[in-house]
A protein has these predicted regions:
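A hydrophobic alpha-helical transmembrane-helix feature that marks the membrane cores
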Residues: 1-271
Length: 271
């Protein structure tokens, strides 16, 4: 099974998860089609990760909740303390380093993923406080818009309206590369004073289009996350991999929130 997600890929590209022995939950001494066998199948309790050793959707939800709990607590503290730009840089740089370590590590390290959530909380809390001061109410708008996008994309994926195909994956990865190149050009331009120091995002019209494209791209990457989580569960990925799945989901949601925050700020600054 191949994964396009750079966070989930190293774990879920492995083969052989399904060959794990989850442990017996029913009797196996009866013929496969015997009444006793069927009765055991119906009466057996639902398998959990504690009994099978495999990742379940409940595991992913629980780990995601833990990571976002840490992010919210640290972010709330950073917001309350009204920390300066230095802490914003520490948060983003620390988060970037840990994102790279966790993404390319073959070993799942929950402690590093929780630490990543803390750094992101520091960065997002500080940045959100700044945006809230410039555009009152923007943070609640961005949070609600991010949640709405998450729910909408999840519904579209679960209903089968959007399917992950090799072509879809190639298009998304190509779009990501293009977006990263534009981001680099924008950053270089900001140093040269383009867009009043905001780079391409400060250029009227173009900045709005880039922001909309960023929100759309981050939303579509949620689909890749959902697909890889489902494939990991179907392949019998180890329970520990639920941490990696939760981490990958958090990375995309943080990216989506930042893109939404930037889009709303551009829209409100043009009023």
């Amino acid at each position: 099974m191949r994964s396009s997600n750079p966070v989930l890929g190293r774990a879920f590209n492995q083969r052989g998860f399904a060959s794990m022995n989850p442990g017996a939950t029913i009797q196996h001494d009866a013929p496969a089609d015997s009444p006793q066998k069927l009765e055991d199948l119906y009466s057996a309790p639902s398998a959990s990760s504690l009994r099978t050793g495999r990742m379940t959707i409940d595991d992913v939800v629980t780990r995601t909740g833990i990571l976002f709990g840490v992010l919210v607590v640290v972010g709330g503290a950073a917001w309350t303390l009204n920390l300066g730009p230095a802490f914003l840089m520490i948060g983003f740089l620390g988060g970037f380093v840990l994102a790279m370590v966790n993404s390319f590590s073959k070993t799942v390290r929950p402690a590093l993923m929780i630490t990543y959530a803390g750094f992101e909380g520091l960065a997002l809390g500080t940045l959100s406080h700044y945006y809230e001061g410039a555009y009152p109410g923007i943070v609640s708008q961005a949070v609600l818009a991010t949640l709405a996008a998450f729910v909408g994309v999840l519904f579209a994926y679960r209903s089968g309206k959007i399917r992950v195909t090799p072509k879809f994956t190639r298009v998304m990865m190509g779009a990501m590369i293009g977006y990263l190149v534009l981001g680099l050009v924008s950053m270089i331009g900001s140093f040269a004073g383009v867009g009043n120091g905001m780079g391409l995002y400060g250029v009227s019209g173009l900045g709005l289009l880039l922001a909309i494209g960023g929100v759309a791209l981050a939303s579509f990457f949620l689909i890749l996350d959902f697909d890889q989580i489902q494939k990991g569960i179907n392949a019998g990925a180890p329970e520990q991999e639920s941490w990696r799945a939760a981490f990958g989901l958090m990375v995309t949601l943080v990216w989506l929130y930042l893109e939404v925050l930037r889009l709303i700020s551009i829209l409100r600054s043009s009023d």
